[in-house]
Amino acid sequence: MYWKKLLFAIASAAALAAVDPETEGSELQTICSGGECYPRLFKALQDWSTIKEGQQIPPGLDIRVDLSTGKKQARLPIPNEASNMENGIQVVDDSSDYEFTKEFQLVRAQVASGAPDYNVVIKQLDDLVEYASDYTLGYKIITHEFTLLQELIFGQDVPISVKELSSRIIVACLRNNTPCLDFVNTRFPDFVRHLLQEAVDYGRQATDAVEARTQIKRYLSIVEPLLINEPQPINEEALKQLYEVNDQTVQLKVLLIMARLYKGRSHNDDISKRSLESTDVQRWTTELSKAIQSKHLDDFHVRELFHGLYALKKEHGRAVKTYPTFLGWLAEETEARKQRMTQDKQPRDLEQMEFDRLLIESRHMVFGNPMAHRIKNMEYDEL
């Protein structure tokens, strides 16, 4: 097999956020898949070991990927390579040549010329979009070219076609690529804030409403993954304005962002608490508890929205009210999930089972009367 070693930009905070010390060692830290059970937290050895599906990777390990199969392996770092680490983040030499140095040099030269030929820029970027989704190449593009791509997105005189291609490249690089996410969050902590404001400004100025909605979706698709593990400072007013865009996809993306921010606030660290400069908790409680009832949502979106709503209600209690039909929806979901848990004979997806339990328990403990929880769930407690 052909293994390619990766340079990882792993921030200690992001990696530690994936491990809950309060549940470490419990049954929730075991994954069962394909007839095999193994720890959720990957334990590295001196030799290369395979990272199994769903395992969390501690920071600071050497990692390599089989480019033909996508399988990952990790090991403890070699001592003489430890000098490459600073503050838990591997140093990336973004000035070195790589596969696309020549192409991006052409783009950079046009931008710096004072009278750029954007047809040249468009051709180069269009040829590069397909490579950005590659795990290794996407990381190289982000670490070498992110500053340039930012300039193209934020430039006032840059054509929308160039902004679009720059956005598509970043979206492709970030998709399912944790090293890219960690690199951007660590090196460019204000990027999310500026991008949301760019989305608002573009929406105001655009003359083509359809084109504007499409580009706003791209910007939000960049923001979404950057907030999964790493809370960022956010201007809530920008999100409020974007939520007014008459597009269901845009509105769902805004709610997913808000849900992740509120979920992050529940960890009680300073960065999470500053993620929202001001917060209209009642409005977002209403919108989240209304949107989660949609029949068109998949399980992933239901979980994401619910975690944010759960965090909101836990933090603010009776000070916030859910949408009038939410408690009825929650009661139906609770009964359906309890029934599924009693009927399932085969081992279930751990993450789904964990979420089902959270939803069931929260019906009375968080969203209703805690005194009713034990009575209503005597049978469930014995599962």
Curated annotation (Swiss-Prot):
A motif (Prevents secretion from ER) lies at residues 380-383. InterPro entries: ARM-like, Sil1_fungi. GO terms for cellular component: endoplasmic reticulum; endoplasmic reticulum lumen. Keywords: Endoplasmic reticulum, Protein transport, Signal, Translocation, Transport. It comes from the Eukaryota. Residues 1-17 form the signal peptide. Interacts with KAR2. Required for protein translocation and folding in the endoplasmic reticulum (ER). Functions as a nucleotide exchange factor for the ER lumenal chaperone KAR2. Belongs to the SIL1 family. This is Nucleotide exchange factor SIL1. It comes from Eremothecium gossypii (strain ATCC 10895 / CBS 109.51 / FGSC 9923 / NRRL Y-1056) (Yeast).
